[in-house]
Amino acid sequence: MAEQHSTPEQAAAGKSHGGLGGSYKVIVYEMENFQGKRCELTAECPNLTESLLEKVGSIQVESGPWLAFERRAFRGEQYVLEKGDYPRWDAWSNSHHSDSLLSLRPLHIDGPDHKLHLFENPAFGGRKMEIVDDDVPSLWAHGFQDRVASVRAINGTWVGYEFPGYRGRQYVFERGEYRHWNEWDANQPQLQSVRRIRDQKWHKRGVFLSS
């Protein structure tokens, strides 16, 4: 994806590509615990530090969900941000100590239903596991190995994790086909837990909370 040059103010006004108006809103703070300079966004922002903010210390998602990235232009490690408060870096990242968060976009949820197919080999080969309207904290517990080399997201939006219990690097699967693990920006074909990303529009009881 080519880097775009829009400021947080432009994103907040919905001028950048992908603006979704009032249905998505996030407040980004420069310091931990919602202190310091702040920036409100209602659309994608490929470079959070281009204008007002020197860094990102905490986040409040008022409506979403959103997908944040470690680097500019929607690159690097991914972080799913559902409705709620994230007072410091370890509230959105559980894989390593990285307080770098430089780009952000709304995460489209195409409906209340969820279906996901996981495959052992690239190009949808080998063993297959189907998950329907459920969260799976351990693929091993369901008789599947940790090697996942291709994925079909039939319905809904999902997030996969490197380790059991929704730990490690996060990989988002929006509706579509992923023939090889490099298509979800992974370095190896390893997934050990997956869950649904839900929108309060259909799921009024709220969103996922990590233990």
Swiss-Prot record:
| Record remark on domains | Has a two-domain beta-structure, folded into four very similar Greek key motifs.
Known InterPro entries for this protein?
Beta/Gamma-Crystallin, Beta/gamma_crystallin, G_crystallin-like
Q: Which PROSITE patterns does the UniProt record give?
A: CRYSTALLIN_BETA_GAMMA
Q: Species name for this entry?
A: Bos taurus
Region entry N-terminal arm, spans? 2-23
Q: Which family does it belong to?
A: Belongs to the beta/gamma-crystallin family.
Q: What is this protein called?
A: Beta-crystallin B3
Which positions bear N-acetylmethionine?
A: M1
Q: How does it assemble?
A: Homo/heterodimer, or complexes of higher-order. The structure of beta-crystallin oligomers seems to be stabilized through interactions between the N-terminal arms.
Q: Where is this region: Connecting peptide?
A: 109-113
Q: Name one GO molecular function term.
A: structural constituent of eye lens
Q: Which UniProt keywords apply?
A: Acetylation, Eye lens protein, Repeat
Reported function = Crystallins are the dominant structural components of the vertebrate eye lens.
What residue spans carry the region label C-terminal arm?
Answer: 200-211
Residue numbers of N-acetylalanine PTMs: A2
Lineage top rank: taxon: Eukaryota
PANTHER family assigned = BETA-CRYSTALLIN B3, BETA/GAMMA CRYSTALLIN
According to its UniProt entry, one GO biological process term is: visual perception
One Pfam family hit:
Crystall
Q: Which residue intervals define the domain Beta/gamma crystallin 'Greek key' in the entry?
A: 24-63, 64-108, 114-155, 156-198
